[in-house]
């Protein structure tokens, strides 16, 4: 489903450098936990990115936090990967706090089709034009597309015409795109 988590990993940045990677998080029902050695730096958590993002390799290459924030994720054949990301500034947390909740956010945008008309409507196909094919892994302060991101049209043809509202028609890279049609 849309909110399904298949894998989860995290990384810690201290003084602008990636210093730790966490890939085997403890899971209980719908929550994951990890133990931190100290309460400093910024913790980032990713879900459903294990096949896309190699945190260990990034750490070994000496990745800076600024490089991390500029990391992009790309659509494959017009399909954006369904991932989640979250961020927690540990320096801002109250001292003595042992459990720190982090909410993960969807890293993609969802298109829903809502049909509103006075008569009957049936839709056989839909084309989304000029979709950006990359987005930032970690949400920026405001939604924006990576510079130079490829664009592509995405067409949906339905075996049976759509006759009613359809949720989750398309999942695309998060973007600001005045050319999207």
Task: Locate each region found by the language model.
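Tryptophan-paired
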Residues: 2-59, 114, 119-181
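Short strand-edge motifs at loop-to-beta-strand transitions and within beta-strands
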Residues: 30-32, 98-102
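Structured interaction patches on ligand/partner-binding surfaces of diverse proteins
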Residues: 51-98
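Secondary-structure boundary elements
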Residues: 90-96, 104-110, 114-125
């Amino acid at each position: 489903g849309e909110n399904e988590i298949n894998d989860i990993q995290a990384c810690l940045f201290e003084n602008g450098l990636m210093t730790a990677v966490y890939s085997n998080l403890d899971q209980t029902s719908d929550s994951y936990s990890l133990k931190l050695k100290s309460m400093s730096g910024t913790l980032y958590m990713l879900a459903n990115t294990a096949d896309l993002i190699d945190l260990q390799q990034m750490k070994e290459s000496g990745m800076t936090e600024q490089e991390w924030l500029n990391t992009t994720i790309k659509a494959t054949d017009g399909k954006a990967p369904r991932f989640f990301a979250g961020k927690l500034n540990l320096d801002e947390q109250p001292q003595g706090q042992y459990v720190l909740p982090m909410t993960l956010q969807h890293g993609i945008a969802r298109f829903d089709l809502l049909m509103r008309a006075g008569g009957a409507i049936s839709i056989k196909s839909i084309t989304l034009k000029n979709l950006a094919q990359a987005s930032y892994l970690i949400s920026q302060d405001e939604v924006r597309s990576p510079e130079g991101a490829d664009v592509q049209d995405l067409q949906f043809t339905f075996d049976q015409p759509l006759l009613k509202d359809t949720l989750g028609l398309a999942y695309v890279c998060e973007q600001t795109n005045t050319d999207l049609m």
